[in-house]
């Protein structure tokens, strides 16, 4: 039932957008974003950011260190 209600609301909003209802569009989007942020995103965003940052930093550091070490050893030898 929830899914059907959401789809009907989406269709109504799209019709309003085509007709030129700007005020309704902004209010509805803000309410939906706030609800989603409170329920889903805070945990997911923190988890994803930590994972991505750690992986990217570690990979970059190791790649740079390996490249520098290889170049130095080759030059010294």
Swiss-Prot record:
This protein's species is Sepia officinalis
Q: Where are the stretches annotated Disordered? A: 1-77
Basic residues bias (residue ranges): 20-77
This chain's function reads: Cuttlefish spermiogenesis is characterized by a double nuclear protein transition: histones -> spermatid-specific proteins (T1/T2) -> protamines (SP1/SP2). The protamines compact sperm DNA into a highly condensed, stable and inactive complex.
The free-text tissue note of the record is: Testis.
Q: Where is the protein found, in the record's own terms?
A: Nucleus; Chromosome
| Keywords linked to the UniProt accession | Chromosome, Developmental protein, Differentiation, DNA condensation, DNA-binding, Nucleosome core, Nucleus, Phosphoprotein, Spermatogenesis
Reported modifications of this chain: Phosphorylation occurs at different degrees. The triphosphorylated form may be predominant in T2. SP2 appears to be phosphorylated in elongated spermatids, but dephosphorylated in mature sperm cells.
- Gene Ontology MF annotations: DNA binding
Biological-process GO terms, alphabetical: cell differentiation; chromosome condensation; spermatogenesis
Record bears the keyword Ribonucleoprotein:
no
Renumbered to this chain, region (Hydrophobic) spans: 1-21
Gene Ontology cellular component terms for the protein in this record: nucleosome; nucleus
Q: What is the lineage of its organism?
A: Eukaryota, Metazoa, Spiralia, Lophotrochozoa, Mollusca
Designated name of the protein: Spermatid-specific protein T2
């Amino acid at each position: 039932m929830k899914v059907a209600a959401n789809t009907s609301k989406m269709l109504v909003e799209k019709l309003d957008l085509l007709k030129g209802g700007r005020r309704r569009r902004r209010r509805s989007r803000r309410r939906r974003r706030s609800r989603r942020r409170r329920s889903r995103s805070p945990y997911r965003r923190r988890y994803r950011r930590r994972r991505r940052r750690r992986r990217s930093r570690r990979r970059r550091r190791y790649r740079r260190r390996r490249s520098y070490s290889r170049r130095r050893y080759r030059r010294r030898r």
